Amino acid sequence: MLFQEEIKKNSQDIAQVFTYKDIEENEKNGKISALLSLEEGAIYQREPQMLRKFYEQGVRMATFTWNYENDLGYPNRFYNPLEQKMWSAGETAGLKEKGLEMLEEMEALGIIPDVSHLSDGGFYDVAKYAKRPFLASHSNARGIAPNAARNLTDDMIRILAEKGGVMGLNFCVSFVRENWKPKEDGALLSELIRQIKYIICVGGEECIGLGSDFDGIEEAPSEMKNAAGLPLLAEAMEREGMLYSQVEKVFFKNVKRFLKENL
């Protein structure tokens, strides 16, 4: 597996984690922790045993969909080839029967359900049937950027927070910017901070982390082109009046708390 090959080549700096104890051990040894996750439920081939095989390979977090309908459920935005346009699934299109089976199997194995990319209806199904906290790894607030249907509504943010979950701030400009238009420059740090403050206002300080999606977005933030620029965001957050304790929560403490309780 390419993931494990890369880990092996860089083993002096990074190590795969399977449990929270592995994260603690990596911290002691000065190593970065890498948690293997899956994005796109079709890869499970509708079979719980496939999910078990992925778990054995170290998968500890997984989505139900990517950008297309599959046997588990619906994405929040998908392309309708008959009408040649993008559609939002909304609240009526939830998890399918196989999706509910996979949710149950995920929780039985210890794989954390990830609701990013999932339809509104799918989110509410996970919220209803999940027995443990879940997360949205790279989703923002729809209250600011409604053009991105994959963002979470205020109601979703509150539910996620009440259940002990976290959401990772996506740096993609269309997920960040109000009234975004195609071909605009990347998001500004001030726009990322506006999202962070909004999410904290809706769901509290414990529910927000970073889910940059650097490897999946076309336009990185204008002032932060890759992960090396993250200290710039931390500095900007303090300049914008956020407490250092809040910066710590957003950057690592909230996600660490979530993983300690659920990994």
What is each residue range found by the language model?
Residues 1-48, 64-69, 73-87, 92-107:
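A metal-dependent hydrolase metal-coordination microenvironment
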Residues 15, 33-37, 60-61, 110-114, ...:
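Structural preference for beta-strand elements that scaffold enzyme active sites
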Residues 19, 39-41, 67-69, 111, ...:
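Active-site beta-loop-alpha junctions enriched in small/polar residues
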Residues 19, 58, 113, 138, ...:
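Conserved, mostly hydrophobic/aromatic
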Residues 46-56, 78-135, 149-163, 190-206:
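Histidine/acidic residue-rich metal-binding segments in metalloenzymes
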Residues 166-175, 180:
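A conserved active-site cap/scaffold subdomain adjacent to cofactor or substrate pockets
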Residues 170-171, 202-225:
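Short acidic/histidine-rich active-site segments
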Residues 225-263:
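Mid-to-C-terminal alpha-helical segments outside catalytic/metal-binding sites
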